Amino acid sequence: MDQKTIKAHKISDSEYKKILEILGREPNLLELGIFSSMWSEHCSYKSSKKYLNGFPTKAPWVIQGPGENAGVIDIGDGMAAVFKMESHNHPSYIEPFQGAATGVGGILRDIFTMGARVEVNMNSLRFGDVIGDSKVNRYQRYLVKGVVGGIAHYGNCMGIPTIGGETTFDSSFNGNILVNAFALGIVKSDEIFYGKAEGAGNPVIYVGSKTGRDGLGGAVMASDSFNEENKSLRPTVQVGDPFAEKLLMEACLELFKKGYIIGIQDMGAAGLTSSSFEMAGRSGSGMIMHLDKVPMRENEMTPYELMLSESQERMLICAKKGCEEKVKEIFAKWDLDAEVIGEVTNSGNMELFWYGKKVADVPIAPLSEAAPILDRPVKKPAYLDKIASGNLCGCGVSKISNKEAFDKIFAEPEILNKNFIYDQYDANIGTNTIKKPGFLGAAAIRVKENGVNLCMAMDCNSRMNYINPRIGAALAVAASGRKVAMSGAVPLAITDCLNYGNPQNEEVMWQFAQGCEGIKAACKALNTPVVSGNVSLYNETDGVSIQPTPAIVMVGTAKNALLPSHFTKNGVNVYLIGDTKGVFAGSLYMKVVENRITGTLPEIDFIKERALWDLVIEANKCEILEFANSVGVGGVAITLAKMACIEQIGGNFDMIVDDDRDIFDESFSRAIVGVKNETEFLKLAKKSGLKFTKLGASGGETFKINEISVKIKQLAEIYFNKFSQIIKGETF
């Protein structure tokens, strides 16, 4: 095998030597392509697995943790929630509409392949600078429109509600946006299916759309960094057909009720290669596949193309012997291809044939269960010492008034209502949505089968992760859990999408290692295990890595009514729970007012964090709260302002602070609550041991906090309209 071909497949010298040892010979081109895909960062987690192994993954309510298509938790009365988050960053930067659309399609398949009907779509998005008229600004606005359009197209056509998410902006994402897709489904606990292929002689059946040449090398592309040349890689981005996926989902859900199959796997990254190797690998089996029997969309396709294509809307099934025709009948009813292309063996090898000729023979375990694990060097980034020594705004650096600061921060795209985005999503289809986009806090659905309210919240502060990757990642867990708890639900488990830069950079690997330590510590302390997730590395363009972004989704349940996260009526007494400590490192104030990222972060007090959750959950059970919201980006002032805008209810608030600017501080573990019964609330609050302070009351036509006063109609006009104007290029 010539060096040019080996390098083109992103195989290192040491990896090629390992391939020779495994095979005892030179690989052919097809085998090299298989090794390249299965050992890619995207499929093998070779740089990250060392750190992921320490995550807490078990709890009495966890049915399935990491290692399957998605995680599963018990939500009571014989029902389970199946959920996962994944990235489609690289494809979405190259071709935003199709990249984002197929990201949605891929995560939906991960859910319904477990036997669950998908009920929820959410997304975590990061873009660069959208304000201004530079080439970069215009391109970022184009990416926003394309990504949102792709998400809306696929989710709406599938009939699955998109009910929440988060979207933020920073120049570190100018060359590498992030598109993380989350989905959740509901299934009976005893009707879950897994990705396995066992039982020698059982047939292997290809179902779904035909295979074309789209997406070739996608897994390898997602394991590489960007430069200007990568923008020409549109042919490697898959093209999705949500209507075909809708048919595939319904066909699979019908099939699951019949008892015809052993296991099923989505054909995602690396297509037929990953699905076949993963199914056989989990079961310790072998497999024979006849590639000439694969349904093809294009002429003269080769075994290499068929194994590595990432054409969408396809599944691989291991059926019970004798049930082949029954399986095919179901898919024919839904106008989908279903062809027996092979069978399970006991050989432990993947044997591939092309019109009767063996074209590949590869041991399965070294590719699926025993891929190389790298121990990359780590080094604390030099920039951390520099930013840790900088002056903070609390030291009197800022020269503008609090009103000027408020106006600047409130007009930031990160703060503004994202109705331009969520108005494109159907959030109500399925009639289960009870908290949808635009209403702050966690999203929520009703599970009709058992009456449980299921809450989901996303969070990650990339700036704080840049300042301290360990504390920043832990904060993402805590903050997502806090949002769920502020709805009155009990946080149960997380899924994650760990977005970092180039792992070949030892400073990036240090960030990643620290981030994993933070997640591990937070999940253990808060008793919220990790049940699924994804790692996205090589988020780098021209040598510039993104800010670390370990996006977290927390899922929780409540049997009682959920709390709103905004002002619902006049005359409600409003309290702040938690300590204000003057935390400005990584804050939006620091970015917007002072145009820098400086300082150090305090440790998170997980005991106080959990106490805050428990206080609000208990208060909601006792029906003594009117609303509750986590204090987030922009601090108390901005959080209150957003809560006021939703129903245009003003408020009069006085916050006693050590420094005037502390109304913008972003201290952890704080909440704002509206109290219906002060006597009972004060009893619970005192019992919790947490600090609590009365801020004032909701009501009126003016929003006032300390010296800041603005008409609520004026505030709402900015909040609901400015983001759309920015993305349309109407205002800068």
UniProtKB/Swiss-Prot annotation:
Residues given in the record as substrate binding sites: S87, H88, N89, H90, R109, Q238, E310, S311, Q312, S536
Gene3D superfamilies cross-referenced by the UniProt entry: PurM-like C-terminal domain (3.90.650.10), PurM-like, N-terminal domain (3.30.1330.10)
Subcellular location: Cytoplasm
Pathway: Purine metabolism; IMP biosynthesis via de novo pathway; 5-amino-1-(5-phospho-D-ribosyl)imidazole from N(2)-formyl-N(1)-(5-phospho-D-ribosyl)glycinamide: step 1/2
Listed InterPro entries: PRibForGlyAmidine_synth_PurL, PurL_linker, PurM-like_C_dom, PurM-like_C_sf, PurM-like_N, PurM-like_N_sf
Gene Ontology terms: cellular component: cytoplasm
Catalytic reaction equation(s): N(2)-formyl-N(1)-(5-phospho-beta-D-ribosyl)glycinamide + L-glutamine + ATP + H2O = 2-formamido-N(1)-(5-O-phospho-beta-D-ribosyl)acetamidine + L-glutamate + ADP + phosphate + H(+)
Gene Ontology biological process terms in this record: 'de novo' IMP biosynthetic process
Domain of life: Bacteria
Presence of the UniProt keyword Nucleotide-binding in the record: yes
Enzyme class: ligase
Binding-site residues for ATP, renumbered to this chain: Y45, K84, D496, G533
Binding site for Mg(2+) 1: E86, N534
EC number: 6.3.5.3
Sample GO molecular function, one term: phosphoribosylformylglycinamidine synthase activity
Keyword terms, alphabetized: ATP-binding, Cytoplasm, Ligase, Magnesium, Metal-binding, Nucleotide-binding, Purine biosynthesis
Positions of the catalytic residues: H42, H88
Residues that bind Mg(2+) 2: D110, D266
Pfam families in alphabetical order: AIRS, AIRS_C, FGAR-AT_linker
Entry function: Part of the phosphoribosylformylglycinamidine synthase complex involved in the purines biosynthetic pathway. Catalyzes the ATP-dependent conversion of formylglycinamide ribonucleotide (FGAR) and glutamine to yield formylglycinamidine ribonucleotide (FGAM) and glutamate. The FGAM synthase complex is composed of three subunits. PurQ produces an ammonia molecule by converting glutamine to glutamate. PurL transfers the ammonia molecule to FGAR to form FGAM in an ATP-dependent manner.
Subunit structure: Monomer. Part of the FGAM synthase complex composed of 1 PurL, 1 PurQ and 2 PurS subunits.
The family this protein is said to belong to: Belongs to the FGAMS family.
Protein name: Phosphoribosylformylglycinamidine synthase subunit PurL
Originating organism: Campylobacter hominis (strain ATCC BAA-381 / DSM 21671 / CCUG 45161 / LMG 19568 / NCTC 13146 / CH001A)
Gene that encodes it: purL
